[in-house]
């Protein structure tokens, strides 16, 4: 069944498939090296907080004061915090995308994503006196909380600034140091799990002392060094100093597996991969320097070489991986996606997908595939719609939705609501994932957050235009977005004039309904800014309130100004017609000269009603460019362009429009030349561009004439070579194409020669030019030409192991034992070296 290009990132951890999806390629600032940084990432595609890692030796550049920099997922800096407080112990993000920073003296500072401080509070006197050694920011049903461990080994929890801190029970034998700890949320309660030697200690609120669980591992080890709790707080992973991994339920009553990783080095992070289908966790991701290991509950594994430094971010349906050069997500493959794209899939959705492809190809096999899934076609359509929601690639989404659209035509009384809903959401998701917005969330995350939260996050990031479009697309009210923007301006911008100007520009669109300056003026008054409130009232742009009154008062200068600010062209036209009736033309011109939009509309009115009068305006203003355009339009309408080109060019020259004047001269020369050549060679060249003229001459074999035009009109060598190559290949003049390639060094390289040969299905000719292509392109061209033997040799000569691996996966090579053996031998030789 269908094998899509995106299956290349699938991998199996028996019995399930997982996939690694690239979300973006971050463009970090040149001075940011993540290897030396402490990074905290917000979930749901949120921002990153980055500061120097105090445990690493970092060359200090510039200001030596600690700084926390905040980036979005594309590497664009959103803000920064000059840390002028005490020692920073921990950082984390709240569910409201607030950065929470925990200081050594138990003070918590809260910042927004732009680095602006919002509030600060203390975790309590006892924690403040004894000092903090570690801290955690955790999520619960009650919101975001903070947990700290003091130098005395006590753990305190605080849900938010308004709640009282809670002290967890004492740690048994607290003189012994704990090596790791984590916070677990159970309903509305949160408790702590600590790893100490070979024990796990549970500190539950309300108890006097913690409870100890020991002997979880069967194999010998010295101590537990890492604890990881799944996103849903139902599963637990423990990692020992000897590389043993224990997976089980968070209450430690059920053990899934015990796995020996065989590694003695310290893991960087360990996170559970949540299942997007049923919110379960089936595997953990463990990161080491330059290495990533995935182990599931069945003790099966998969591993990848990776960047030396990486950061894992637990999500509700996967784990994001951020490195210096990549941003990816690892997910368990949704069952519906596997059903469609898995090799040899026998599922109805897979047959439907293939049927739709064959239907587009107009193949009779479409009906054969349809017959295989007709009994369960409703299930197939549902799976295609669901699979589209899980995909990140827009092309794959389109393919799946086309399949669903195709399939639902065979279902009587099919309800299209789900299809339309998913299509709308996917358009929103693709917009959010764009680098400009940088919110790479999944469909499941979008559904969990709900659209109101998404819109709020867009508004807070000041993506007001996108938020409005999303609201429109999802049939949600948009007025609150504009009101939020205006209120934000009123509260934060001290310049009354600037605020009034910005609000006017935003609200001048006549499509905006339900909002007036009166509402914003009222808020300005509530904020004690009466001057601004008056300005906002004066700037009301709706015709029923301001402009008609100004016209009645004959305040034409203010009327045209208000109408122009409103952006309503019909209103401006109404004002101009009134002015024309009651003012002398000279005064009217003087009034509207300071309002370019009104002036342009007035010219449009004159153009439609009095062209001669329009020419008089241009002469009065000595606007030579406009005069040239006036003559140009007249020439086109009267089909007298050739005879008027000289006059038009002179007008452009007087208006200092050098480029336009030169174009007129060139056009005149070209027209004359085309007439001569048309007569000489009995072909029609009239009305063609320079490019098309040269192409026609090449097609009839007049190379010298083409060379002459190229020289006279300064056609670049690259374009001319392209024209020759395309022309020769379209006429199958392969010997002349070869002569051209050998005549001198090609200014466009030799890739185009290969491309045109392959376009004409002439592999033998393409083979001649591939050796002359750049080294890094030869393997690609050999593969496109299905010259797999040469591709293998070329990749081996270039020591390109990556290309050899790609060749190894090629279906044609897999089916050819000789070629497959050759690829494997080459890989073995290169890796052996």
From Swiss-Prot:
Q: Does the record carry Membrane as a key word?
A: yes
Indicate yes or no for the key word Glycoprotein.
no
Q: Which UniProt keywords apply?
A: Autophagy, Cytoplasmic vesicle, Endosome, Lysosome, Membrane, Protein transport, Transport
Q: Name one GO biological process term.
A: crinophagy
Q: Which Gene3D superfamilies match?
A: Vps16, C-terminal region
The topology of this chain with respect to the membrane is: Peripheral membrane protein
The disruption phenotype is:
Light orange eye color, probably due to impaired deposition of pigment granules. Impaired autophagosome clearance in fat body cells of starved 3rd instar (L3) larvae. Accumulation of Notch in photoreceptor cells and boss/bride of sevenless in R7 photoreceptor cells of developing larval ommatidia.
State one molecular function term (GO).
actin binding
- UniProt-annotated location(s): Late endosome membrane; Lysosome membrane; Cytoplasmic vesicle, Autophagosome
Function (record text): Core component of the class C core vacuole/endosome tethering (CORVET) and the homotypic fusion and vacuole protein sorting (HOPS) tethering complexes involved in endo-lysosomal vesicle trafficking and lysosome biogenesis. The CORVET complex facilitates docking and fusion of endosomal vesicles during endosome maturation, acts upstream of HOPS, but is not involved in autophagic flux. The CORVET complex may cooperate with the early endosomal tether Rbsn-5 to mediate endosomal fusion.
Q: How does it assemble?
A: Component of the homotypic fusion and vacuole protein sorting (HOPS) complex, composed of Vps16A, car/Vps33A, dor/Vps18, Vps39, Vps11 and lt/Vps41. Interacts with Syx17 (via SNARE domain); the interaction may involve multiple components of the HOPS complex and may promote assembly of the Syx17-Snap29-Vamp7 trans-SNARE complex. Component of the class C core vacuole/endosome tethering (CORVET) complex composed of at least Vps8, dor/Vps18, car/Vps33A and Vps16A; unlike in other species, Vps11 is not part of the Drosophila complex.
Regarding protein family, the annotation reads:
Belongs to the VPS16 family.
Name of the protein: Vacuolar protein sorting-associated protein 16 homolog
Give the originating organism.
Drosophila melanogaster (Fruit fly)
Name the lineage: Eukaryota, Metazoa, Ecdysozoa, Arthropoda, Hexapoda
């Amino acid at each position: 069944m269908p094998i899509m290009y995106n299956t290349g990132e699938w991998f199996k951890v028996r019995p399930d498939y997982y996939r690694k999806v690239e979300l973006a390629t971050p463009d970090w600032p040149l001075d940011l090296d993540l290897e030396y940084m402490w990074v905290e990432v917000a979930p749901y595609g949120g921002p990153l907080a980055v500061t120097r890692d105090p445990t690493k030796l970092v060359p200090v550049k510039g200001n030596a004061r600690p700084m926390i920099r905040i980036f979005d997922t594309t590497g664009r800096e959103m803000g920064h915090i000059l840390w002028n407080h005490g020692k920073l112990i921990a950082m984390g993000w709240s569910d409201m995308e607030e950065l929470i920073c925990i200081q050594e003296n138990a003070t918590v500072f809260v910042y927004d994503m732009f680095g602006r401080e919002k509030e600060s509070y203390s975790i309590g006197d006892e924690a403040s006196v004894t000092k903090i050694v570690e801290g955690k920011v955790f999520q619960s049903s009650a919101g975001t909380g903070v947990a700290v461990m003091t130098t005395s080994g006590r753990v305190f929890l605080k849900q938010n600034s308004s709640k009282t801190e809670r002290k967890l029970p004492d740690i048994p034998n607290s003189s012994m140091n704990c090596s790791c700890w984590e916070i677990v949320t159970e309903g509305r309660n949160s408790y702590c799990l600590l790893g100490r030697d070979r024990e796990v200690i549970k500190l539950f609120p309300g108890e006097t002392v913690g409870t100890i669980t020991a002997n979880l591992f069967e194999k010998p080890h010295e101590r537990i060094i890492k604890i990881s709790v799944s996103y849903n707080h139902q599963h637990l992973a423990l990692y020992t100093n000897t590389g043993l991994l224990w997976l089980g339920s968070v209450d430690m009553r059920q053990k899934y597996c015990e796995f020996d990783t065989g590694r003695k080095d310290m893991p960087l992070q360990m996170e559970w991969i949540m299942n997007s289908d049923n919110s379960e966790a089936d595997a953990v991701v463990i990161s080491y320097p330059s290495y990533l290991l995935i182990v599931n509950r069945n003790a099966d594994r998969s591993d990848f070489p990776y960047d030396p430094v990486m950061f894992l971010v637990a999500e509700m349906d996967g784990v994001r991986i951020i490195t210096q050069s990549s941003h990816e997500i690892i997910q368990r493959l949704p069952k519906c996606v596997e059903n469609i794209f898995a090799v040899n899939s026998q599922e109805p959705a897979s047959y439907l997908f293939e049927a739709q492809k064959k239907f587009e190809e107009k193949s009779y096999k479409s009906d054969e595939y349809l017959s295989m899934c007709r009994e369960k076609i409703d299930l197939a359509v549902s799976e295609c719609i669901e699979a589209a929601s899980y995909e990140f690639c827009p092309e794959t989404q389109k393919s799946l939705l086309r399949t669903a659209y195709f399939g639902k035509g065979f279902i009587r009384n099919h309800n299209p609501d789900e299809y339309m809903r998913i299509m709308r959401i996917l358009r929103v998701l693709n917009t959010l994932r764009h680098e400009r917005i940088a919110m790479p969330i999944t469909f499941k995350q979008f559904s969990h957050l709900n659209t109101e939260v998404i819109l709020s996050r867009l508004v807070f990031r000041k993506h007001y235009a996108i938020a409005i479009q999303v609201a429109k697309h999802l049939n949600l009210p948009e007025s609150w977005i504009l009101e939020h923007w205006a209120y934000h301006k009123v509260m934060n911008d001290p310049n009354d004039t600037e605020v009034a100007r910005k609000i006017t520009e935003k609200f001048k669109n006549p499509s905006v309904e339900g909002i007036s300056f009166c509402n914003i003026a009222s808020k300005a008054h509530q904020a004690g800014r009466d001057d601004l409130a008056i300005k906002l009232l004066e700037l009301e742009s709706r015709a029923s309130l301001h402009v008609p009154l100004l016209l009645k008062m004959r305040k034409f200068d203010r009327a045209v100004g208000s109408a122009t600010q409103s952006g309503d062209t019909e209103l401006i036209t109404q004002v101009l017609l009134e002015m024309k009736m009651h003012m002398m033309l000279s005064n009217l011109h003087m009034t509207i000269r300071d309002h370019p939009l009104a002036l342009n509309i007035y010219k449009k009115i004159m153009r439609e009603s009095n062209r001669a009068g329009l020419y008089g305006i241009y002469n009065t203003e000595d606007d030579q460019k406009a005069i040239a355009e006036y003559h140009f339009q007249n020439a086109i309408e009267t089909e007298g362009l050739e005879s008027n080109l000289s006059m038009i060019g002179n007008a452009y020259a007087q208006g200092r429009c050098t480029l336009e004047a030169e174009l007129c001269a060139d056009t005149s020369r070209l027209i004359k030349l085309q007439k001569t050549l048309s007569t000489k060679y009995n072909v029609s060249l009239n009305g063609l561009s320079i490019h098309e003229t040269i192409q026609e001459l090449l097609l009839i074999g007049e190379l010298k004439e083409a060379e002459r035009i190229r020289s006279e009109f300064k056609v670049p060598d690259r374009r001319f070579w392209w024209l020759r190559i395309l022309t020769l290949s379209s006429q199958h003049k392969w010997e002349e194409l070869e002569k051209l390639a050998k005549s001198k060094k090609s200014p466009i390289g030799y890739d185009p020669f290969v491309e045109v040969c392959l376009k004409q299905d002439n592999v033998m000719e393409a083979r001649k030019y591939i050796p002359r292509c750049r080294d890094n392109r030869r393997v690609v061209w050999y593969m496109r030409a299905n010259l797999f033997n040469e591709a293998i040799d070329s990749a081996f000569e270039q020591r390109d192991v990556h290309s050899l691996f790609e060749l190894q996966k090629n279906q044609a090579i897999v089916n050819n034992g000789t070629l497959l053996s050759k690829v494997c031998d080459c890989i073995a030789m290169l890796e052996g070296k």
